[in-house]
Regions:
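Active-site-adjacent bridging/hinge elements
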Residues: 7-18, 64-77, 165-170, 306-329
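A short, charged/proline- and glycine-enriched loop
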Residues: 15-21, 82-84, 219, 330, ...
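Flexible, membrane-associating and regulatory peripheral segments of lipid-active enzymes
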Residues: 1-23, 44, 86, 138-146
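Extended, Lys/Arg-enriched charged tracts that mediate electrostatic binding to polyanionic substrates
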Residues: 187-214, 218-221, 229-231, 343-345
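Active-site gating loop/helix substructures
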Residues: 170-183, 217-359
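Patatin-like phospholipase
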Residues: 32-199, 236-248
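Catalytic or ion-translocation cores adjacent to nucleophile or general acid/base/metal-coordination motifs
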Residues: 111-129, 345, 352, 359-374
């Protein structure tokens, strides 16, 4: 039942409302930059809601957050509105940005540094594996073919494509990519893993005092899809034969953050969990043919080269790979590819999670499906 603010006779009673959003982030090649922009707007809205609710003074440095604050203040006399994002499910590019947004919501951390991550580090020349990167005379027969393609684009396609074809940068990077290693993934898996670790680290450490954009007692659940290349055995009940054995390749990595009413934090999104979050980001975005399949040994090697520890490694394995462990499989042999291969739009995960939420005031529940259309 909706709770109402006390009011004197004759005054209009202020409505108390919680807008809860479950985000479903679509997976697709090259959508990471667009998803990042959406994530920043969602973070600005949630932060503006907390600012108005808690009557925090001072203008925000974010122009969009200031606009959201102004809007919420305008309606505050009639509606005491709190915006909460409590469920995020994502695949591939959506999975990466869902991970980053979840940690930002859990500990009230910034996402501004990720602009550089996507615009500068998310570059063909940066992602190419140095071992297979084209040299000056690699595949020289490709050069006249690329020149012909550029001429055809300028002649046959629209203005936007024509402008892109004339771009020296586009032509140089296309040449570099097509002349690099064939018949093996051209991009470096370890480079991508380092990017994910750097992206999470650039958000900053956990705050010394509890600080979160989640209301006390309200959990934030994150679901990231990936594809287990080898899969695990499972029984399927039929009529004749009564039971068959098949292999399940869909795999979900889940994380939860909860701050109790007395201030204690039970979170799987802390600074100590960064390697596990980076694991999920690398696995869900391991696009077949572009990146090599991801294995836990790759994460171990990158962390070792950096002199970093992973204290929660075994805890993460025990929690996330129960089916493999129950069948005696070695997690080191498991290989993961892009979550979009089998579960590109994880709406079912968000809908199922919504069913277990409680409320102590009026709630307007929305499931928001994010599919950028560049």
């Amino acid at each position: 039942m909706a709770s109402q603010q006390d009011s004197t006779p004759g005054e209009k009673r202020r409505r108390s409302l919680e807008l809860r959003m479950a985000l479903v982030c679509y997976g697709g090649v090259s959508l990471a930059v667009y998803m990042h922009g959406v994530s920043r707007e969602v973070l600005a809205l949630v932060r503006a809601s907390k600012t108005v609710k808690d009557q925090i003074t001072g203008r925000s440095d974010s122009p969009s957050q200031y606009i959201y604050e102004t809007l919420l203040e305008t309606i505050h006399d009639s509606v005491d509105l709190r915006v909460v994002v409590d469920i995020i499910a994502g695949a591939s590019a959506g999975g990466i940005n869902g991970i980053m947004l979840s940690r930002a919501l859990a500990f009230d951390l910034p996402l501004e540094s990720h602009r550089k991550l996507w615009l500068e580090l998310g570059d063909v020349t940066e992602l190419l594996d140095p071992k297979g990167k084209a040299r000056a005379w690699s595949k020289p027969f490709m050069r006249p073919m690329l020149s012909f393609v550029g001429w055809w684009q300028r002649k046959s396609l629209g203005q936007v494509a024509s402008d892109a074809a004339r771009s020296l940068e586009v032509r140089q990077k296309l040449s570099l990519l097509t002349r690099s290693r064939w018949f093996q993934p051209p991009f470096s898996g370890e480079r991508m893993t380092r990017m994910m670790l750097d992206g999470l680290a650039s958000m900053g450490p956990d705050p010394q005092s509890p600080s979160s954009l989640m209301p006390a007692g309200h959990a934030l659940d994150l679901f990231v899809t990936n594809t287990d290349f080898w899969g695990h055995r499972q029984l399927l009940s039929l009529h004749d034969p009564p039971v068959i054995v098949e292999r399940e390749h869909r795999h979900i990595l889940s994380f939860r953050h909860l701050q109790t009413a007395d201030g204690r934090i039970a979170s799987q999104m802390t600074e100590a969990d960064v390697p596990a979050l980076a694991f999920a980001a690398r696995a869900t975005s391991s696009f077949p043919g572009a990146f090599p399949p991801f294995q836990i040994g790759e994460m171990d090697a990158v962390l070792k080269a950096r002199g970093k520890a992973w204290p929660q490694r075994q805890t993460f394995i025990n929690r996330s790979f129960q089916a493999l462990l129950a069948q005696g499989e070695d997690i080191a042999d498991a290989a993961f590819i892009d979550g979009s291969v089998l579960m590109n739009k994880p709406l079912a995960l968000a809908i199922k999670a919504v069913q277990n939420r409680s409320a102590n005031r009026e709630v307007d529940r929305r499931i928001v499906y994010i599919d950028p259309n560049p």
